[in-house]
Amino acid sequence: MAKPILLSIYLFLIVALFNGCLAQSGGRQQQQFGQCQLNRLDALEPTNRIEAEAGVIESWDPNNQQFQCAGVAVVRRTIEPNGLLLPQYSNAPQLVYIARGRGITGVLFPGCPETFEESQRQSQQGQSREFQQDRHQKIRHFREGDIIAFPAGVAHWSYNDGSNPVVAISLLDTNNNANQLDQNPRNFYLAGNPDDEFRPQGQQEYEQHRRQQQRQQRPGEHGQQQRGLGNNVFSGFDADFLADAFNVDTETARRLQSENDHRRSIVRVEGRQLQVIRPRWSREEQEREERKERERERESESERRQSRRGGRDDNGLEETICTLRLRENIGDPSRADIYTEEAGRISTVNSHTLPVLRWLQLSAERGALYSDALYVPHWNLNAHSVVYALRGRAEVQVVDNFGQTVFDDELREGQLLTIPQNFAVVKRARNEGFEWVSFKTNENAMVSPLAGRTSAIRALPEEVLATAFQIPREDARRLKFNRQESTLVRSRPSRSRSSRSERRAEV
């Protein structure tokens, strides 16, 4: 009788702790004065590259002033077929966009039940009866166009079960209140011997050499000879402690420390595909299940609102944490929120469409501009925007509060551009078109257009426009009503545009 009571108390404490952490993560820390005094923005390429056994990790320098202004860090991972990204957690919440490929991921919420389990007959095939049948927490499928949300401190892993590489762009919101360390992005690995993804390679080699020298200089320290030289969270513990904690022999405990593992953070699964317990779905079945998940989530959200109005608190662990939907596809053209037939489309994901983003305080936008189409001048009301170019090229201009052009250049595939909050921006696709994903530092990032049907100019009275710009009312009326589209428009050929491109090429 005592065990069920203790289990109930434990689950209640886990719920209270986790809900407190999630609630605390709502919001961002105050920026230091002057961090966003940017006179110039740049389209940035990755500055650090790590080649792992089954993939590549590329990161942008988090100390760059643009990332310091936005309070974020960005990493791009390429996972080869049959590649496994080892279990890890980070000090900041993160959004991941799947630019290419498909696979599976597991997210390890503390205290949640292991709802995926193999049958008893299957577990006994080829094994003695003393082994228990395997069970683990839920596994989620992902595909191209998905946004995946990972809360701070929650461990997760990913595996490429397809025939093409998976390319994933991850943004870590280091300025989020959930991060109580410092502004440096930190990944904590549960296995392997990974490199620090945000530290230059030469600096990492120096740090490893320095640690080895320190250990050699202190051979008499208690337990020092039993500690590994790996870089995962088990490496710094005494092997005896680990053996006691897991109730295994010391040799097995030492394997956890991955001292001589040189595969880094993306490893190859040898032989056949990774054997885990999961439903086998076709593409149609997966999309049908996604729709069901969204419907269940809307119903649960409605019930929670009714409960709060009725004065009842929802305290079920499985309802609040374990069944969180962490994924939303914004790459499918049929999912578009804004569509102009000759210009392009935009899809967004925010806390209304993916409620977990309410706690992460992040959202995203996926856009596609057709050849020579224009995303009208606009600004982000309440968020910084980190734009990653997925395909093609675009002319981009960004203007600050002094009316100065801080960026006037081309943004190409694989590059990043940070657009600070309230800075005005315009994008025009080149001949091959332009596709991008924008990570935004607010759960419900809002955009205000400067031209078009829903613009600030359209909302002003004609007389105000005429007086402000010193133009006749007829011209003010044309400013307001000549453009009927809302956001994306088909642009006309411009002689000044071609001459500007020629001047840029000469420079």
UniProtKB/Swiss-Prot annotation:
<feature type="region of interest" description="IgE-binding">
    <location>
        <begin position="57"/>
        <end position="71"/>
    </location>
</feature>
<dbReference type="InterPro" id="IPR006045">
    <property type="entry name" value="Cupin_1"/>
</dbReference>
<feature type="region of interest" description="IgE-binding">
    <location>
        <begin position="257"/>
        <end position="295"/>
    </location>
</feature>
<feature type="region of interest" description="Disordered">
    <location>
        <begin position="191"/>
        <end position="233"/>
    </location>
</feature>
<feature type="region of interest" description="IgE-binding">
    <location>
        <begin position="121"/>
        <end position="143"/>
    </location>
</feature>
<protein>
    <recommendedName>
        <fullName>11S globulin seed storage protein Jug r 4</fullName>
    </recommendedName>
</protein>
<feature type="region of interest" description="IgE-binding">
    <location>
        <begin position="105"/>
        <end position="119"/>
    </location>
</feature>
<feature type="domain" description="Cupin type-1 2">
    <location>
        <begin position="328"/>
        <end position="477"/>
    </location>
</feature>
<dbReference type="GO" id="GO:0019863">
    <property type="term" value="F:IgE binding"/>
</dbReference>
<feature type="compositionally biased region" description="Low complexity">
    <location>
        <begin position="214"/>
        <end position="228"/>
    </location>
</feature>
<comment type="function">
    <text>Seed storage protein.</text>
</comment>
<keyword id="KW-0708">Seed storage protein</keyword>
<keyword id="KW-0732">Signal</keyword>
<keyword id="KW-0758">Storage protein</keyword>
<dbReference type="InterPro" id="IPR022379">
    <property type="entry name" value="11S_seedstore_CS"/>
</dbReference>
<feature type="region of interest" description="Disordered">
    <location>
        <begin position="281"/>
        <end position="316"/>
    </location>
</feature>
<dbReference type="GO" id="GO:0048316">
    <property type="term" value="P:seed development"/>
</dbReference>
<dbReference type="InterPro" id="IPR006044">
    <property type="entry name" value="11S_seedstore_pln"/>
</dbReference>
<feature type="region of interest" description="IgE-binding">
    <location>
        <begin position="377"/>
        <end position="399"/>
    </location>
</feature>
<dbReference type="Pfam" id="PF00190">
    <property type="entry name" value="Cupin_1"/>
</dbReference>
<comment type="similarity">
    <text>Belongs to the 11S seed storage protein (globulins) family.</text>
</comment>
<feature type="region of interest" description="IgE-binding">
    <location>
        <begin position="233"/>
        <end position="247"/>
    </location>
</feature>
<feature type="disulfide bond">
    <location>
        <begin position="36"/>
        <end position="69"/>
    </location>
</feature>
<keyword id="KW-0020">Allergen</keyword>
<dbReference type="InterPro" id="IPR050253">
    <property type="entry name" value="Seed_Storage-Functional"/>
</dbReference>
<feature type="disulfide bond" description="Interchain (between acidic and basic chains)">
    <location>
        <begin position="112"/>
        <end position="322"/>
    </location>
</feature>
<feature type="signal peptide">
    <location>
        <begin position="1"/>
        <end position="23"/>
    </location>
</feature>
<dbReference type="GO" id="GO:0045735">
    <property type="term" value="F:nutrient reservoir activity"/>
</dbReference>
<feature type="region of interest" description="IgE-binding">
    <location>
        <begin position="481"/>
        <end position="503"/>
    </location>
</feature>
<feature type="compositionally biased region" description="Basic and acidic residues">
    <location>
        <begin position="281"/>
        <end position="315"/>
    </location>
</feature>
<feature type="short sequence motif" description="NGXEET; peptidase recognition motif">
    <location>
        <begin position="315"/>
        <end position="320"/>
    </location>
</feature>
<dbReference type="InterPro" id="IPR014710">
    <property type="entry name" value="RmlC-like_jellyroll"/>
</dbReference>
<feature type="region of interest" description="IgE-binding">
    <location>
        <begin position="89"/>
        <end position="103"/>
    </location>
</feature>
<feature type="domain" description="Cupin type-1 1">
    <location>
        <begin position="41"/>
        <end position="254"/>
    </location>
</feature>
<feature type="region of interest" description="Disordered">
    <location>
        <begin position="484"/>
        <end position="507"/>
    </location>
</feature>
<feature type="region of interest" description="IgE-binding">
    <location>
        <begin position="1"/>
        <end position="15"/>
    </location>
</feature>
<feature type="region of interest" description="IgE-binding">
    <location>
        <begin position="313"/>
        <end position="327"/>
    </location>
</feature>
<feature type="region of interest" description="IgE-binding">
    <location>
        <begin position="417"/>
        <end position="439"/>
    </location>
</feature>
<feature type="region of interest" description="IgE-binding">
    <location>
        <begin position="465"/>
        <end position="479"/>
    </location>
</feature>
<keyword id="KW-1015">Disulfide bond</keyword>
<feature type="region of interest" description="IgE-binding">
    <location>
        <begin position="145"/>
        <end position="159"/>
    </location>
</feature>
<keyword id="KW-0389">IgE-binding protein</keyword>
